[in-house]
């Protein structure tokens, strides 16, 4: 699945795609000749590789295959270049260790960071703007990490808000939201924030982000997703009165100590993360808002 995605990335951005170097091992003779103008100690020159040598890609197999597939669809890409780091092959064991080292020590950017820096993706950029325009989020969102440290003044994570917003409009990220859907997302979070008492206390400066994270579930990414799921159903069933329905959020006990969240968002006093728990939490929110569970959602409930 990664190869088609990388291939499409190349084809959709032929002028400004970005790749890191490939890494390969060569099991034959290699000879480096410095450029004449740089003398014998020059670091720039030509690398000669015996064509009978075997080349093993230690890092970049998916990129290499995606480039091959992209060239089939757009031969004009044939003039493009990619840098390659070559190592002398010291045997299978060494190549395997190199593969392990390269992949084990690679640092994968967080989902929040991908959203923050993805200027091509319209939804990502919309979410970045959203957290600066909705009062409860403004200045209280961790933009780079998917978790929040104990001392942080942030209450929410960027990826949590993004995921919950997608659930609200029933979308996967592959389809872009319309302008009307973007307006709905913004309006929804504004209405939700007005109906969660602790969020209002945070806006008023009468409590802190750390206190909310410590004592309540509603800043947690999983709970945000549940609020998004519930919102999608509430709006679908009450297109003209959903704002009134959301006033019932005031009646919910959002504290971690509440039995409502046990085995849904909380297990033995600790927040837990799994898809079933998010759906089960959404069921609580729906029922507290006076919405009957559908047959499918009741089946989820019955498994608890």
Question: Where are the predicted features?
Answer:
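Accessory terminal alpha-helical modules
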Residues: 1-304
